[in-house]
Amino acid sequence: MNLLIMGLPGAGKGTQAEFIVKNYGVNHISTGDMFRAAMKNETEMGKLAKSFIDKGELVPDEVTNGIVKERLAQDDIKASGFLLDGYPRTIDQAHALDTMLEELGIKLDAVVNIVVNPNILVDRLSGRYICRNCGATYHKIFNPTKVEGTCDVCGSHDLYQRADDVPETVKNRLDVNIKESAPIIEHYTELGLVKNIEGEQEISQVTDDIKKVLG
């Protein structure tokens, strides 16, 4: 089975990716792992990627695509299939993936897309507060303080949010993700591959729904 998994930050993609890999015995391929392995093994594309990273530059698409193709060409992929996580990030990468899969004779079976309302994700991702005095961490929904505004550990009233946890920052980050992922999802929908999964349910129910669509 050859799969992609998609979903906005905070949608629970990582948890469900772990389940799919364990349940279906496919290889979990994440962009970070691929880059690290390619650089460690000093593959042609790995050396190229390292040359950009060492200069503090963004790795161009053609190098990223090359690293993905190197990984998909390996024997364990032919034997067990894959779950691709974190790629493609742009519509150009999606078209490149189509081409490389065709060249390698690999068929993509499904795109698992975990759907959660962005407003809910803002709440999930922006609810973290930290005690400036002792460093204890809280979440306004999942782990609130017993007394509002007071640290359970040290009793301090000095609770703060990190800049990247502020709702406006989180919303901006999600907006960028939505803008980039929308054409990719549309592309795979046209190919009849997208399986939309309701991600606002309990984790176990999300997992059950994935089992239903993948068989």
Curated annotation (Swiss-Prot):
Transmembrane segments: none annotated. AMP binds at T31, R36, E57, L58, V59, G86, Y87, P88, R89, Q93, R162, R173. Pathway: Purine metabolism; AMP biosynthesis via salvage pathway; AMP from ADP: step 1/1. It is found in: Cytoplasm. Zn(2+) binds at C131, C134, C151, C154. Monomer. This is Adenylate kinase. The gene is adk.
